[in-house]
Amino acid sequence: MGAAGCSESFLDQEPENVIPESMIYEDKELVLSVLSNLYGRVNWGQNNGDYGSYDQLDEANKCYGSPWVIFTEYDRNSWRVRDYDFVRRVNLFLQGVRGSSALQDSEKKAFEGEARFLRAWHYFHMARTLGGMPLVGDQVFNYESGIDVETYQMPRSTEAGIYDYIISECDEIARQLTEQMTINSARANKWAALMLKARAAVY
């Protein structure tokens, strides 16, 4: 014969396998892991990471170079879903870095420059595909059930306006980033920002 009981606090325990966001930006190594994740999400062109190839202007079909799968119907617009999700992730990162008490000012400057570069690069590829589109800047929108979605609607910028934004961003980014090659040569530096500025100016 035995007895068992429980308390309400049992349901309020924090999961042990999830790091609270409030802790992430108080640890430089965790900040680096978030930045690394952003690099891994960057759109390097007309590819969404599934190794299928797409027509440049029509993602309705994709094909693989294998005899058993040639064409696969693709009936959801995965490209557009990912566009502003990435911008939001960068903006959340910028908020966290700027508000961190664990990072030195020089570290904040460098992290911010890299994240802004990735966002500018992302906008560059979006502009090449879509032309003009809304620019959200550093804003982070937190949608809650019942909110009128029209409050989040933003005017569409012109294509020229997008490239002007990228050029302006790259001028500031170049002042934030080092001229030296980083240990990981894939990370952005001043020259990468100036390269992106030059490419945007061509358009």
Language model regions located:
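TPR/Sel1-like alpha-solenoid repeat signature
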Residues: R116, L194-A200
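Bacterial N-terminal signal peptides
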Residues: M1-A3
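Aromatic- and acidic-residue-enriched carbohydrate-binding clefts of CAZyme catalytic domains
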Residues: Y143-T151
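Membrane-proximal, proline-rich intrinsically disordered regions
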Residues: G5-G49
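Conserved, well-structured interaction surfaces
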Residues: D27-L32, S36, G40-W44, K62-L130, ...
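Short, well-structured active-site flanking segments
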Residues: A127-V140
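Aromatic-lined, polymer-binding surfaces characteristic
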Residues: Y143, N184-M195
